[in-house]
Curated annotation (Swiss-Prot):
Record-level GO BP terms: phosphocreatine biosynthetic process; response to heat
Domain Phosphagen kinase N-terminal stretches: 11-98
Record's GO cellular component terms: extracellular space
SUPFAM superfamilies linked: Glutamine synthetase/guanido kinase (SSF55931), Guanido kinase N-terminal domain (SSF48034)
The protein's name: Creatine kinase M-type
Organism phylogeny: Eukaryota, Metazoa, Chordata, Craniata, Vertebrata
GO molecular function, one term: creatine kinase activity
Entry keyword set: ATP-binding, Kinase, Nucleotide-binding, Phosphoprotein, Transferase
Subunit: Dimer of identical or non-identical chains, which can be either B (brain type) or M (muscle type). With MM being the major form in skeletal muscle and myocardium, MB existing in myocardium, and BB existing in many tissues, especially brain.
Function recorded in the entry: Reversibly catalyzes the transfer of phosphate between ATP and various phosphogens (e.g. creatine phosphate). Creatine kinase isoenzymes play a central role in energy transduction in tissues with large, fluctuating energy demands, such as skeletal muscle, heart, brain and spermatozoa.
Length: 381
C-alpha cells in the first residue's frame, strides 16, 4: 500500500525539484494548488504526530482525477495538518468551497425546527431521504495516520458512548471483523454499510490499513439512525428512511447527533471544531458541516433535459449515481444532495435540498405531460 512517512528525513537528501511530483496530467484541487514553491516551503515540516506534506498529497498524486467529479486530492492526518500545511490547504479550501477565505467564519445550526417544510416531498419520485455527517474526536489522529492502538481506542470510546443512547436511538454495535461475508454484503447492498476498501482514494491515503480491524457499524433498532466507526472519519453519523420525509430524517439527525456530542464531551473527548473550518474532518471537501443531505429521486425526463446540469448548479445541488460517488444512475434514479459544506449552516444546506428537489419534481411532472419548463428554470442561488 503506497503509504508511510518514515523516510521523510531521507527524502531531504534530494533537492525539492527532484522530489516534486509530476502533476502535469492531474485534474484535482491539490494538483492545481501545489506549486514547486509551496512544496519547497512545506516539505520538511511535520505535525506533532509526524504527518508530512507527502502524506497529505499522496492520494492525489496516485489518483490524477475522476471522470465525474473534481476530487480534492489530499487528506489531513490530524487536527494540526490544516495549520501546519495551511499554505497548501487554504487555496484548496478556497477553490473547493466557492471562494471561502482564510479569514472567513463558519456557522453551525443544528436546530431542526428552523427547517421549513420538507415533510411533503412526493414519495412517488423521492424514494429515500438521508442526512449524514462526519465527526473527529479530539486528541486522536485521523484515519490516514492513526495507529492500530489509536484506532481501537476510538472504537472503544465510540461504542461505549453509542451504547448509552436510549429511546428511539437505542441500538447495537456490529464490528466488521465478526460479520460473515454475506452479512456484510447485505448491509452494503441495503446502503447501510460502507463499501469494502477498494476505492483508490481510501487505499492511497492509508485509510484502509489493518482493515477490518476496529471498524464497524452501530445502528438503532429500526435502522433509521446509523454510525460508521473508523472508515474515512472517526465517526460518520447517518439518519435515513424510505420515502420523502426529509423533515423527520433531519429531526432525528440533529437530535441524535447532539446527544452523541454531549456524551463525548462529558467523557472529556469533544469533537474537533474551530470557528474557521467548522467540524474538522479527514477530507477538506467535508469541512464545515460535513453534511450531505441527499435523496434518491426519480427524474426520467428531467435528467434527459439539456438544462439538467445547469439547473442542479443553480440550485447548489450535485448529483451522484444511485450507488454513490463512483456509480451510474440506475432507472433514472439519482442521488441528489447539497453541494456546499463550508460557510453555511446545516439547516441552510438541507433547506436547499428540500426546496431544490421539490422544484425538480414539479419540473419532472410538467415534462411528463409534454409541457415546457423554461419558465421554471431557477436563478442562481
Amino acid at each position: 500500500m503506497p503509504f508511510g512517512n518514515t523516510h521523510n528525513k531521507y527524502k531531504l537528501n534530494f533537492k525539492a525539484e527532484e522530489e516534486y511530483p509530476d502533476l502535469s496530467k492531474h485534474n484535482n484541487h491539490m494538483a492545481k494548488a501545489l506549486t514547486l514553491e509551496i512544496y519547497k516551503k512545506l516539505r520538511d515540516k511535520e505535525t506533532p504526530s509526524g504527518f508530512t506534506l507527502d502524506d497529505v498529497i499522496q492520494t492525489g498524486v496516485d489518483n490524477p482525477g475522476h471522470p465525474f467529479i473534481m476530487t480534492v486530492g489530499c487528506v489531513a492526518g490530524d487536527e494540526e495538518s490544516y495549520v501546519v500545511f495551511k499554505d497548501l490547504f487554504d487555496p484548496i479550501i478556497q477553490d473547493r468551497h466557492g471562494g471561502y477565505k482564510p479569514t472567513d467564519k463558519h456557522k453551525t445550526d443544528l436546530n431542526h425546527e428552523n427547517l421549513k417544510g420538507g415533510d411533503d416531498l412526493d414519495p412517488n419520485y423521492v424514494l429515500s431521504s438521508r442526512v449524514r455527517t462526519g465527526r473527529s474526536i479530539k486528541g486522536y489522529t485521523l484515519p490516514p495516520h492513526c495507529s492500530r492502538g489509536e484506532r481501537r481506542a476510538v472504537e472503544k470510546l465510540s461504542v461505549e458512548a453509542l451504547n448509552s443512547l436510549t429511546g428511539e436511538f437505542k441500538g447495537k454495535y456490529y464490528p466488521l471483523k465478526s460479520m460473515t461475508e454475506q452479512e456484510q454484503q447485505q448491509l452494503i447492498d441495503d446502503h447501510f454499510l460502507f463499501d469494502k476498501p477498494v476505492s483508490p482514494l481510501l487505499l492511497a491515503s492509508g485509510m484502509a490499513r489493518d482493515w477490518p480491524d476496529a471498524r464497524g457499524i452501530w445502528h438503532n433498532d429500526n435502522k433509521s439512525f446509523l454510525v460508521w466507526v473508523n472508515e474515512e472519519d472517526h465517526l460518520r453519523v447517518i439518519s435515513m428512511e424510505k420515502g420523502g420525509n426529509m423533515k423527520e430524517v433531519f429531526r432525528r439527525f440533529c437530535v441524535g447527533l447532539q446527544k452523541i456530542e454531549e456524551i463525548f464531551k462529558k467523557a472529556g473527548h469533544p469533537f474537533m471544531w474551530n470557528e474557521h473550518l467548522g467540524y474538522v474532518l479527514t477530507c477538506p471537501s467535508n469541512l464545515g458541516t460535513g453534511l450531505r443531505g441527499g435523496v434518491h429521486v426519480k427524474l426520467a425526463h428531467l435528467s434527459k433535459h439539456p438544462k439538467f446540469e445547469e439547473i442542479l448548479t443553480r440550485l447548489r445541488l450535485q448529483k451522484r449515481g444511485t450507488g454513490g460517488v463512483d456509480t451510474a444512475a440506475v432507472g433514472s434514479v439519482f442521488d441528489v444532495s447539497n453541494a456546499d459544506r463550508l460557510g453555511s449552516s446545516e439547516v441552510e444546506q438541507v433547506q436547499l435540498v428540500v426546496d431544490g428537489v421539490k422544484l425538480m419534481v414539479e419540473m419532472e411532472k410538467k415534462l411528463e405531460k409534454g409541457q415546457s419548463i423554461d419558465d421554471m428554470i431557477p436563478a442562481q442561488k
